[in-house]
Regions:
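Intrinsically disordered, low-complexity terminal tails/loops enriched in metal-binding residues
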Residues: 21-170
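N-terminal export/membrane-targeting signals
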Residues: 1-23
Length: 170
């Protein structure tokens, strides 16, 4: 009996370890965002992975950069869209996720944050603590497209300030 229990725990441990290691395969394959260059491991809680029907993949840091890729590749059909769960950082199906828009937590590449959660209860708890609105993927993507002009200006301003600071240090 002890051998069976030990064997069972060993199998569970190995499967868990395999799942954890494969969960970050997308980060190894796409370590930085194609559009802004941000470190996808650092932003694992907001990263996205697009799998197109032609077999190509694109790794981004956020829904903002994913929206850009989807707009630039109108002739390619997304087969799967993955997003990092805000609370666990595991990749989940973006179209099945519960999305929170807005709130007090600063967003990634955007003024109006957009976070994905695998579980509705976790998203609702986050809402109570941080504010925002609950939506689905289509609502989050629409919000991202609505925000792109203002977000692009914000990103340009930040980068200009960073360049000025670097010049002052020289």
């Amino acid at each position: 009996m002890k051998k069976i229990i030990l064997l069972l725990f060993s199998v569970i441990f190995i499967l868990s370890l395999t799942t954890i290691l494969s969960a970050n395969e997308d980060i190894k394959k796409h370590s930085s965002c194609k559009y802004c260059g941000m470190d996808r491991e650092k932003f694992a809680h907001s990263r996205m992975l697009i799998e197109y029907d032609d077999g190509t993949q694109v790794g981004t840091c956020s829904l903002h950069c994913t929206a850009i890729d989807l707009a630039l590749n109108l002739d390619k059909t997304p087969k799967l869209l993955w997003v990092g769960d805000y609370s666990t950082q595991a990749l989940i199906n973006a179209e099945k996720a519960f999305w929170v828009i807005g709130g007090t937590k600063p967003g990634v590449m955007t003024k109006r944050a957009k976070w994905a959660f695998a579980q509705k209860e976790v998203a609702e708890k986050f809402l109570k603590e941080n504010g925002g609105n609950l939506t689905d993927f289509d609502g989050a993507l629409k919000a991202s497209y609505e925000d792109i002009a203002e977000d692009t200006k914000m990103i340009r301003d930040r980068r200009r300030m960073m360049r000025q600071k670097m010049m002052e240090k020289k």
